[in-house]
């Protein structure tokens, strides 16, 4: 992570007025096809594409396959070995994303689909799919309207903005505020309670928004918002979350073992935006759960449900689809976090925790407890008679 940060801080296209990058260095990435042994012609030039006629190499050998096709054939041969495919990408990278992939062993998710989506996101077609920015209260007046302001240094990544009639859809009931677009989607959040840590490396806050099928003008089963940041204070993070909820008009499922965010929402009058845990009926909730909502994400059964939710989403909606299209999650940070997710050590996986809660929130009907209806035969003590013949007889 430190080397990747150094590399990103050395982007030559992002220099200050003195002509310096943030690190004072210039980054350089050379894709593997530019210098792959066995695919250089006699003039020292790479043979990128398969030639119509064989090309002579520097030692007189014939080159009849382009390096790109050779690379794709090797990758295709590893499609049933996700760990091997990941290692192949790391050793022979064609993109910066390939070069910075971590070593991944025994991933519990479908790495092939995750990598298909990452490679697709790196393509030209998705370059404008994500906008960075921040949410602001209109004219600085809290609890009014929320607006989105594009900003290259913003904390939010978004791929969909609802139409004006869907923005800031707040319903007021019994003096409380409730989301007006809960039929369109929901949010998941991995919060934190402490503003700072002694080493400055505390986990980040994460927020993800996901849509479901609806009749509204909105994408279907699409992650439309990604927020992975740790502002200077926890209150800034809480306000960021609140503004996103209000702007999209959707409810939130958050961890309640770190409850400051949920108390913040309640104090501001937005308790109606905090979902109760979907796996229990209201009369089974604890006192704190009734007060602020949320779900404890520490028990083993919740961990398994959470991981299964992500796994199901990846299998259905990530990577290459049966119709030849690709999934519409354009956030590579989240995809990379899924690829590295360790269910036994989830502390560093803020994006995976948050996105999994969003999936659970959108599929909350799957976790609702089922009530078994039992029928009981009641004996009212009525006498029964046999009316055959001229005289009826009591049935004993």
Regions found by a protein language model. Give the residues of each.
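Short mixed-charge
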Residues: 5-19, 282
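RNase H-like, metal-dependent nuclease domains and their acidic two-metal-ion catalytic environment used
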Residues: 1, 5, 19-24, 36-277, ...
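Structural signal for short hydrophobic segments within the conserved structured cores
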Residues: 26-28
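Conserved AAA+ ATPase "SRH/arginine-finger" region at the nucleotide-binding site
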Residues: 30-35
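Short alpha-helix plus adjacent loop in nuclease-associated cores
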Residues: 274-319
């Amino acid at each position: 992570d430190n080397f990747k940060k150094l590399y990103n801080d050395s982007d030559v296209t992002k220099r200050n007025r003195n002509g310096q990058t943030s690190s004072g260095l210039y980054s350089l990435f050379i894709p593997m096809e530019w210098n792959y042994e066995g695919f250089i012609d006699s003039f020292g030039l790479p043979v990128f594409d398969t030639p119509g006629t064989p090309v002579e190499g520097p030692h007189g050998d014939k080159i009849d396959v382009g390096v790109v096709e050779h690379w794709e054939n090797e990758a295709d041969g590893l499609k049933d070995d996700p760990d091997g495919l990941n290692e192949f990408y790391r050793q022979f990278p064609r993109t910066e994303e390939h070069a910075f992939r971590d070593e991944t062993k025994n991933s519990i998710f479908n790495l092939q689909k995750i990598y298909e989506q990452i490679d697709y996101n790196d393509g030209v077609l998705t370059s404008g799919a994500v906008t960075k920015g921040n949410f602001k209260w209109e004219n600085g007046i809290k609890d009014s309207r929320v607006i989105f302001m594009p900003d290259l240094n913003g904390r939010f990544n978004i791929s969909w903005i609802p139409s004006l009639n869907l923005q800031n859809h707040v319903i007021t009931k019994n003096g409380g505020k409730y989301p007006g677009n809960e039929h369109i989607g929901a949010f998941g959040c991995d919060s934190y309670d402490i503003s700072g840590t002694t080493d400055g490396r505390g986990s980040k806050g994460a927020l993800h928004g996901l849509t479901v099928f609806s009749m509204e003008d909105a994408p279907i089963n699409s992650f439309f918002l990604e927020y992975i940041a740790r502002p200077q204070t926890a209150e800034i993070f809480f306000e960021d979350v609140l503004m996103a909820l209000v702007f999209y008009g959707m409810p939130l499922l958050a961890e309640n073992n770190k409850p400051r965010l949920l108390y913040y929402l309640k104090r501001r009058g937005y308790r109606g935006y905090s979902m109760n845990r979907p796996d229990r009926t209201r009369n089974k909730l604890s006192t704190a759960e009734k007060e602020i909502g949320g779900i404890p994400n520490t028990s083993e059964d919740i961990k398994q449900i959470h991981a299964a939710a992500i796994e199901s989403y990846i299998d259905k909606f990530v990577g290459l689809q049966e119709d030849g299209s690709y999934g519409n999650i354009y956030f590579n940070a989240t995809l990379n976090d899924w690829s590295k997710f360790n269910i036994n050590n989830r502390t560093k996986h803020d994006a995976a925790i948050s996105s999994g809660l969003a999936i659970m929130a959108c599929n909350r009907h799957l976790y609702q407890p089922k009530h078994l209806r039992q029928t009981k035969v009641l004996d009212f003590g009525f006498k029964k008679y046999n009316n055959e013949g001229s005289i009826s007889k009591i049935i004993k």
